[in-house]
């Protein structure tokens, strides 16, 4: 994949931190079925815990912003509760409560440091979601990209994604009305092989032209992501 051409739009202390961390990390392999990434795009990817988002942060070639749950952006107390009650017991599927409580508590300061550096766009399950969309549109207008992990992880992170939450289609539809026909890249991180498989991008207008509903578009792209996960 092409080297980064842009100065990362992150705070100086975070850029320094990631530059140091990258010295100890192995670069992932990127496999493209079509064109490589471009500016002002929408990227959908599986989550795979914390390793996938951080690997993207280190090596993605263009400026972008992540979407993330609002509970992780509302202070240490909210973050700690989310780690203890959702991330470890539900997303990571830890069975015992005590380790979830201890690791969630001890991990909050480090996680807060990371989230402050990532500058995540918070997302919501209610009317406040439209504020997330508006903020994302402002980012796209700067020729930056949005990276989303839309998988339904209510039963934990899984290799075979059960479904995509369709919120990203609201963003894509709003962007189209604003004159931005976003190329959508579906991407799958294969953790054991430390590589990203990236499907050929498809414009949102092409998906709409098929007469599909937002749920049908979401289902199609979820299946595309699962297909990439089986890539040999």
Q: Which ranges hold each PLM region?
A:
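A generic local structural motif
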Residues: 27-32, 52-53, 108, 133-134
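A short, well-structured juxtamembrane/interface segment
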Residues: 12-40
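Catalytic core of membrane glycerolipid acyltransferases/transacylases, capturing the structured
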Residues: 38-125
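Hydrophobic beta-strand scaffold residues
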Residues: 28, 64-66, 122, 146, ...
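Non-catalytic C-terminal accessory region of glycerolipid acyltransferases
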Residues: 2-4, 125-232
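Helix-enriched interaction subdomains in cytosolic or periplasmic regions
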Residues: 1-13
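Short aromatic/hydrophobic-glycine micro-motifs
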Residues: 25-26, 119-120, 230
């Amino acid at each position: 994949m092409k080297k980064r051409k842009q100065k990362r739009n992150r705070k100086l202390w975070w850029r320094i931190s990631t530059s140091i961390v990258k010295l100890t990390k192995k670069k992932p392999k990127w496999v493209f079925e079509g064109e490589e990434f471009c500016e002002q795009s929408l990227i959908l990817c599986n989550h795979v815990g914390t390793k996938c988002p951080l690997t993207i942060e280190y090596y993605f070639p263009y400026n972008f912003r992540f979407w993330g749950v609002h509970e992780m952006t509302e202070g240490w107390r909210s973050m700690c509760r989310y780690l203890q009650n959702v991330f470890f017991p539900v997303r990571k599927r830890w069975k015992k409560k005590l380790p979830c409580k201890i690791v969630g508590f001890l991990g909050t300061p480090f996680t807060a440091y990371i989230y402050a550096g990532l500058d995540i766009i918070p997302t919501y399950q209610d009317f406040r979601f439209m504020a997330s969309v508006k903020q994302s549109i402002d980012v796209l207008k700067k020729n930056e990209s949005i990276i989303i992990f839309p998988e339904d992880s209510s039963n934990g992170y899984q290799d075979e994604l059960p479904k995509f939450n369709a919120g990203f289609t609201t963003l894509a539809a709003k962007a189209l009305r604003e004159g931005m026909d976003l190329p959508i890249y579906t991407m799958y991180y294969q953790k054991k092989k430390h590589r990203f498989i990236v499907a050929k991008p498809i414009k949102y207008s092409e998906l709409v032209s098929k007469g599909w509903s937002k749920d049908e578009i979401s289902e199609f792209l979820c299946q595309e992501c699962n297909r990439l996960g089986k890539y040999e």
